[in-house]
Swiss-Prot record:
HAMAP family: PyrG. ATP binds at S14, L15, G16, K17, G18, I19, D71. This is CTP synthase. The active site is at C384 (nucleophile), H521, E523. The keyword Ligase applies. One of its GO terms (cellular component) is cytosol. It catalyses: UTP + L-glutamine + ATP + H2O = CTP + L-glutamate + ADP + phosphate + 2 H(+); L-glutamine + H2O = L-glutamate + NH4(+); UTP + NH4(+) + ATP = CTP + ADP + phosphate + 2 H(+). Gene3D superfamilies: 3.40.50.880, P-loop containing nucleotide triphosphate hydrolases.
Length: 552
């Protein structure tokens, strides 16, 4: 029977519920259990697809084309289970489903209310995410409830998980509450009162935590744990310190050494082999003992919030581990770059990466970045928009297509080398269409797609005959310009079979040592255990660049 662990948060947001949940999942997985994670988001958006990266951070895309919370990226990097649409849902999706049922008459004329209709729907989504009653059912489903206890938005979710725990029984459910202990410098002590209050709020709802994860800058002293235990009705061994660390990959070991997984297994009556965290220890050792360093410039539009590029940042770090080097990433605002100052801004880096993005702001700076990398033989990786700006730059300055641009930025461009995709096959094989008047939400080319890779290319040396990666974009290289770009020397090394959509562009080895742009998002499939072949090759190219003489 599937067991459930519900992870809630209190006092403030952004405490790291996602990392805590993923770490617990990793420990349980190391005990031989089949684990999945489910993220419950209390906002009314149907999904985060139309939300600003400045507000929400990265949108993580799954193989089945779901646009999800960035925490699902942590989940995939920490455990073996691949995430799907059913692993993330929002208040908006729940209400959408309830209203559709009401319109169909599924509620038989009843007055539709938060309790029981919305809370029942939440429970059904949770059970679906856990695969309950199917061959895909897991041993343990860890459900992270977004938001903060006390917020009005989270109340239906908390009520739903309370009800689900009651139905499943005490030996099939556990509650873990993440809280914050502020350090008052003038008093020289940690304060436990906010934690007492947040647990009190949780107990008023009808939820008694089995474990408290106490976030603080440093380890929580034993006397403070005793005090917290007394006032929250949580046994002392369930009050667990979760302090700041220099790498998130230390968290599984931290939680295990304080007995969190043992507590959960006892509560859920799970008889498992001992925990084996050797590969996590090896991973931490690798991060702490690099044999060198490479400097990479990430030229983007959302650099004020590093979470906007969370998976790219992690993929670069993973690739560094594969080559035993530390990757020092500098986020450079593309609005600050032009042809005139690109050398001053970028010459100190070993490689350049231009990630994805939407809208015209900062695009010319990205085009200047691609030009600098091409002309100065700097290793270049363009992802999604990064591939498109590389194509625009090449069209303008090599192919002689004056005014070349994307119709996203200039609808009246004389040479629209990048244009809106009007028809494509989605991840599940269905043919989708759209035009400039279509809704923004849920109308992109999304999910895993496969393409053949041209032999003898850089892409082929990385991927082999076929590339399968996840997509999230509306615009694509214009098929009408491919022959002109090829004649000018641009290598189009991967195309989709049906629509002939460009997946990868690159420069020949004799022209540039390492220059490639991909329309997809390879960062979503990188893991700390093996990295990702494209990022691994990119970091190796940066290492080679270090050895080469630089232009003054």
């Amino acid at each position: 029977m599937t067991k459930f662990v519900f992870v809630t948060g209190g006092v403030v947001s952004s405490l790291g519920k996602g990392i805590a949940s993923a770490s617990l999942a990793a420990i349980l997985e190391s005990r031989g259990l089949k684990v999945t994670l489910i993220k419950l988001d209390p906002y009314i958006n149907v999904d985060p697809g139309t939300m600003s990266p400045f507000q929400h951070g990265e949108v993580f895309v799954t193989d089945d084309g779901a646009e999800t919370d960035l925490d699902l990226g942590h989940y995939e990097r920490f455990i073996e289970t691949r995430m799907k649409q059913s692993n993330n849902f929002t208040t908006g999706r729940i209400y959408q489903s309830v209203l559709e049922k009401e319109r169909r008459g599924d509620y038989l004329g009843k007055t539709v209310q938060v309790i029981p209709h919305v809370t029942n729907e939440i429970q059904e989504y949770i059970k679906r995410g856990a695969g309950l009653g199917t061959p895909d059912a897991v041993d343990v489903a860890i459900c992270e409830v977004g938001g903060t206890v006390g917020d009005i938005e989270s109340l239906p979710f908390l009520e739903a998980v309370r009800q689900l725990a009651l139905k499943q029984g005490p030996n099939n459910t556990a509650f873990v509450h993440l809280t914050y202990l502020p350090w008052i410098a003038t008093a020289g002590e940690l304060k436990t009162k906010p934690t007492q209050h947040t647990v009190q709020k949780l107990r008023e709802i009808g939820i008694q935590p089995d474990a408290l994860l106490c976030r603080a800058q440093h380890q929580v002293p034993e006397e403070e744990k005793e005090k917290i235990s007394l006032f929250t009705n949580v046994p002392e061994w369930g009050v667990i310190s979760m302090w700041d660390v220099d790498t998130i990959y230390k968290v599984p070991r931290m939680l295990h050494e304080q007995g969190l997984d043992g507590l959960i297994c006892d509560k859920l009556r799970l008889n498992t082999p001992p925990t084996n965290l050797k590969r996590w220890d090896d991973l931490v050792h690798e991060t702490e003992h690099p044999q060198g360093e490479v400097k990479i410039a990430m030229v983007g539009k959302y650099v004020e919030l590093s979470d906007a590029y969370k998976s790219v940042n992690e993929a670069l770090k993973h690739a560094g581990m594969q080559s035993h080097v530390a990757v020092k990433i500098t986020h450079v605002d593309s609005e600050t770059i032009s042809d005139a100052n690109a050398r001053d801004k970028l010459s100190q880096y070993d490689a350049i990466l231009v990630p994805g993005g939407f809208g015209s702001r900062g695009v010319e700076g990205k085009i200047s970045t691609a030009r600098y990398a091409r002309e100065n033989k700097v290793p270049y990786l363009g992802i999604c928009l990064g591939m498109q700006v590389a194509t625009i730059e090449y069209a303008r300055h090599v192919a002689g297509l004056e005014g070349a641009n994307s119709t996203e930025f200039d609808p009246k461009s004389a040479n629209p080398v990048i244009a809106l995709i009007t028809e494509w096959k989605d991840a599940d094989g269905t043919v989708k269409t759209r035009d400039e008047n279509s809704d923004l939400g849920g109308t992109m080319r999304l999910g895993a797609q496969s393409s053949d890779v041209q032999a003898g290319t850089l892409a082929h040396s990385i991927y082999g005959d076929v590339v399968t990666e996840r997509h999230r974009h509306r615009y694509e290289a214009n098929v009408q310009y491919l022959d002109q770009l090829r004649e000018a020397g641009l290598v189009i090394s991967a195309l989709t079979q049906r629509e002939q959509l460009t997946e990868i562009v690159e420069l020949p080895k004799e022209v540039h040592p390492w220059y490639i742009g991909v329309q997809f998002h390879p960062e979503f499939k990188s893991t700390p255990w093996s990295g990702h072949p494209l990022f691994n090759a990119f970091v190796k190219a940066a290492i080679e660049r270090q050895k080469a003489p630089r232009k003054p």
